[in-house]
Amino acid sequence: MRCLAFVLLLGAMVFPAFPAGELSGRRAPGFTLPDSNVNYHDLADYRGKIILLDIVQTACPVCGSSHRIFETIRQKFPDKVQILSIVVPPDNQNNVRQFIANFAVKTPVLFDCGQMIGSYLKLTPQKSQATFPHLFLIDANGWIRNDWEYKGGQEKYFESLDPVLQEVTALVKEMQAGGAKAAAGPAKPAAKK
């Protein structure tokens, strides 16, 4: 019976319950970015928490409504989840203040010049276009467990909080169980041939 439990646990570690986006399954690149009050936020300061890293533009028609969904998740797990929103030019302090007021944003909105999002979105001279919003789910050990890219249109980014909530809940249970996936992070995808 113990052998079966071990095999099932090992299987859960190798084959995650949720499919990961194409930018997942790797260590989250570190960053230190300022917010609108020029307070700096370092990703390492949030180690031990699950992070919803949302790369947005304030003019985006779906970014504010999705933020309300993420805030609901943060309120459900206040000591375990942190939301960080990242904006890039042409967004500025005035746009961000208005975005914060319009959508009652209670979590940090950080400013990037493009280098941080370039590393997260794996931008290159050949692949230089980015779509916003883009959400990254980072586990307590600093690994990108999943990512979601907005595919366009006027529909909401997330119709409900279910897809993200299910994954966050699974990560919280994993944390409470003592971190079945140790600091080595999630299983790495097989090498492409």
Regions found by a protein language model. Name each.
Residues A5-P16:
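Bacterial N-terminal signal peptides
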Residues F18-L43:
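N-terminal "domain-start" segment that seeds a small globular fold
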Residues H41-G64:
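Short active-site neighborhood of thiol/selenol oxidoreductases, capturing the structured segment around
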Residues A44, L121, N146-W148:
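Short hydrophobic alpha-helix segments
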Residues L52-L53, I83, L135:
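Hydrophobic beta-strand anchors of alpha/beta hydrolase catalytic cores
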Residues G64-A104, Q115-Y120:
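Structural microenvironment flanking redox-active thiols in thiol-disulfide oxidoreductases
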Residues I100-F132, I138:
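Short, internal strand/loop/helix patches
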Residues F132-K193:
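Thiol-/selenol-based redox modules, centered on thioredoxin-like
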